[in-house]
Amino acid sequence: MDMHCKADPFSAMHRHGGVNQLGGVFVNGRPLPDVVRQRIVELAHQGVRPCDISRQLRVSHGCVSKILGRYYETGSIKPGVIGGSKPKVATPKVVDKIAEYKRQNPTMFAWEIRDRLLAEGICDNDTVPSVSSINRIIRTKVQQPFHPTPDGAGTGVTAPGHTIVPSTASPPVSSASNDPVGSYSINGILGIPRSNGEKRKREEVEVYTDPAHIRGGGGLHLVWTLRDVSEGSVPNGDSQSGVDSLRKHLRADTFTQQQLEALDRVFERPSYPDVFQASEHIKSEQGNEYSLPALTPGLDEVKSSLSASANPELGSNVSGTQTYPVVTGRDMTSTTLPGYPPHVPPTGQGSYPTSTLAGMVPGSEFSGNPYSHPQYTAYNEAWRFSNPALLSSPYYYSAAPRGSAPAAAAYDRH
């Protein structure tokens, strides 16, 4: 009798069910009974771990965790909707609130809207739309796409939360076929009509140079096309206002004959630059800086030096055997150092020039005290030359132009 009353564990398999690994029976696609759900929550409140609840009730650990997680989040133990879609959460009231939030703060995020709906009690945890649903509502219902109507009014797509209010007061924008130029102007884009008195006069002036015409003295050849100009405003017509406006427009485009000739020469040049024509870039006004009177002294010096270097007698002064004998100061002009050109005096004689003699002083002046400063009077005897005959030459280079160090004889004695 008991055997007949005991439920067959395999009978659930015939009803699209089965037995889990813990031995519990379940039906595929059907939620867990409310009694088991309530028992799971009660055991969780008693402090039983989810793994122990799973063993006691023979319910899979995933099912226990899912039920407890939903209970902790929403406070409900009801199962989800079986079949079909979820109940519609984008009610007109919710959509209006979302649109109002976006108008108040266009930069509000979807999750902020969701939290505000819950905080203000517009929706509860079961009916609040998800973040993706809020984004879809904003994209499809709050921001309407542009649909022009036959009367020219329509709504445009703007930034999130901003809507365009259709205005029937402004007339429709004229088509590009009627006014191809005006349709791209500001008035054409905004649909503002232009009255006859405010109609702008446009002069399209094409200025080009004809070389043959310029050479003949005709100046510039002007071709103008007047558009949207009232009748009688042609330059050769009777209206003086059109002529004055065109004259003011062309006044800045006139050139003198010299400017036209300069332009003609520039355009006749080849396309590629030439290194030999670099001198042409110097302005004619800069030629006064290099006048002949200013260059005459320099040219005279160059001429004298060239004539001195061209003297054939200089060849005899150069030593051909490359020997370097010790010579006196008077014969240094006839010697040549290796790797250096021969010294050529400006006067062509074997003597020092006047500028060189100016840097020389007689050797007798060095016989006195080398140091006259009080701090160095004690060193006069130590730094004095032991043999004054070394300074007996007629001329000796001074210390100022040479910049040499003290004599080495003073260091040899220490």
Curated annotation (Swiss-Prot):
Write down the InterPro entries for this protein, in alphabetical order. Answer: Homeodomain-like_sf, PAIRED_DNA-bd_dom, Paired_dom, Pax2_C, PAX_fam, WH-like_DNA-bd_sf
Region PAI subdomain, as annotated, extends over 18-74
Identify the stretch(es) annotated as RED subdomain: 93-141
Residues within the DNA-binding region(s): 15-141
- Domain of life of the source: Eukaryota
Q: Which GO terms describe its biological process?
A: brain morphogenesis; branching involved in ureteric bud morphogenesis; camera-type eye development; cell fate determination; cellular response to glucose stimulus; cellular response to mechanical stimulus; cellular response to retinoic acid; central nervous system development
**Subcellular compartments:** Nucleus
Matching entries from Gene3D superfamilies are given as: Winged helix-like DNA-binding domain superfamily/Winged helix DNA-binding domain
Respond yes or no to whether keyword Ion transport is given for this record: no
User: PANTHER family, from UniProt?
Assistant: PAIRED BOX PROTEIN PAX-2 (PTHR45636:SF19), PAIRED BOX PROTEIN PAX-6-RELATED-RELATED (PTHR45636)
Name this protein carries in UniProt: Paired box protein Pax-2
Annotated gene: Pax2
